[in-house]
Amino acid sequence: MIALIQRVTQANVVVKNEVVGEIGHGLLVLLGVEKGDDQQKAKRLCEKVIGYRIFSDEQDKMNLNVQQIGGSLLVVSQFTLAADTQKGMRPSFSGGAAPDKADELYRYFVEQCRQSGVKTEIGRFAADMKVSLTNDGPVTFWLQV
């Protein structure tokens, strides 16, 4: 399971001209589910995302996590993160989980984030989405479990 996380000052996701998820200061989480992923991996990745210390403390050192700053999450499914780009000029998506399994684990990941107490907004699974953000830094990390 993969999370591409971006520290943002604001982010939103639009489906068919309707804002379906929006946050201020926090993390945009692009989530890719791979074959073989399960609830245990989803829970571990959620814990890592929430606990990852990439927000500045008083000394301007990356030392605080999203929960400590009172930030929010915007979680957007993105199957392209599971692509194999090693060969040729076209990505292969054979490493991605089947859509029903990916949806199940995406929802489980979101549920775990919400249970942690962090405000969590979402995109719409398998929809054509327009994601807008203001990357703060820029600060972007690839997390994988």
Curated annotation (Swiss-Prot):
GO BP field: D-amino acid catabolic process
Catalysed reactions listed for this entry: glycyl-tRNA(Ala) + H2O = tRNA(Ala) + glycine + H(+); a D-aminoacyl-tRNA + H2O = a tRNA + a D-alpha-amino acid + H(+)
EC number: 3.1.1.96
Subcellular location(s) per record: Cytoplasm
UniProt keyword Protease, yes or no: no
Domain of life: Bacteria
InterPro entries the record matches: Daa-tRNA_deacyls_DTD, DTD-like_sf
Entry keyword annotation includes Metal-binding: no
Sequence motif: Gly-cisPro motif, important for rejection of L-amino acids, positions: 137-138
An example molecular function term from Gene Ontology annotations: Ser(Gly)-tRNA(Ala) hydrolase activity
One annotated Gene Ontology cellular component of this protein: cytoplasm
Chief location of this protein within or outside the cell: cytoplasm
Disulfides per UniProt: none
Alphabetized UniProt keyword annotations: Cytoplasm, Hydrolase, RNA-binding, tRNA-binding
HAMAP family (alphabetical): Deacylase_Dtd (MF_00518)
Domain notes: A Gly-cisPro motif from one monomer fits into the active site of the other monomer to allow specific chiral rejection of L-amino acids.
Similarity comment: Belongs to the DTD family.
Subunit description: Homodimer.
Function: An aminoacyl-tRNA editing enzyme that deacylates mischarged D-aminoacyl-tRNAs. Also deacylates mischarged glycyl-tRNA(Ala), protecting cells against glycine mischarging by AlaRS. Acts via tRNA-based rather than protein-based catalysis; rejects L-amino acids rather than detecting D-amino acids in the active site. By recycling D-aminoacyl-tRNA to D-amino acids and free tRNA molecules, this enzyme counteracts the toxicity associated with the formation of D-aminoacyl-tRNA entities in vivo and helps enforce protein L-homochirality.
Designated name of the protein: D-aminoacyl-tRNA deacylase
Designated gene of the protein: dtd
